[in-house]
Amino acid sequence: MAPSWMSFERERIKSNMIIGFRAFIDFERPSQELIEAYRSLPSANIGDCCYKMNCMFDGIHSFNDIPLCGPAFTVKVPAGDNLVAQLALDYAKPGDIIVIDGAGFTNRALVGGMMVTYAKEKQLGGFVVNGAIRDVDDIKNSPIPVYGITQTPLGPYRSGPGEMNVPVCCGGQVVMPGDIIVGDHDGIVVIPQKDADELLQAVRKNLDHEQTEMKKMKSGQYTLQDHQKEFLEKFLKNGGVFK
């Protein structure tokens, strides 16, 4: 059962609905079929098909080496305060990725072992934190994927304000509610929901082409120099240097 203070804050955020302290609970999510299609695709290939424009910076990394894929449930909080991030766990749906914009502040943790344990009970899809986490040992033993910048023993404030399901900035990328978040050992890529169907076909084609080239390289039929030459000629042609 949620503590009494949380019930009070839940009602307060629902009644305020002013900039800085508001919650938008309902938003469109991509189909489960589309999410599952992306789950098996490497973040690097997805990033390549976005011209490397949709990848979060390398400071945000996995703390328990578990890949993630799901719709973004965005949270925006002041530096070092996780009141609204905690409240978000009650509103998020199974499979949602809690994307927390903590402005990159790392002196206080925004997510810890208790929140991750609760997320497991709620069957959430994971956390991506533009800030710090703590209780690393608990997180390493959890099946819930957790990505963040660093760790600290210092806990957060719980004073507010904050916002749910507004545009946020995380790892240098704008994330909208419902965008598909894919994370693995290489990092995290953000897929705008409106582009997800079209991008999927491009990523599959890119991956097939890459795997074919890898097979040729392993058999000695194709060298890295061949690949570089082919890429360079294509680049120069697209740039108008070659006709």
Model-derived features: positions:
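Feature captures the catalytic cores and cofactor-binding loops of soluble hydro-lyases/lyases
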Residues: 3-177, 191-243
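C-terminal binding/interaction regions
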Residues: 181
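Beta-strand-loop-alpha-helix segment that lines the small-molecule cofactor/substrate pocket
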Residues: 184
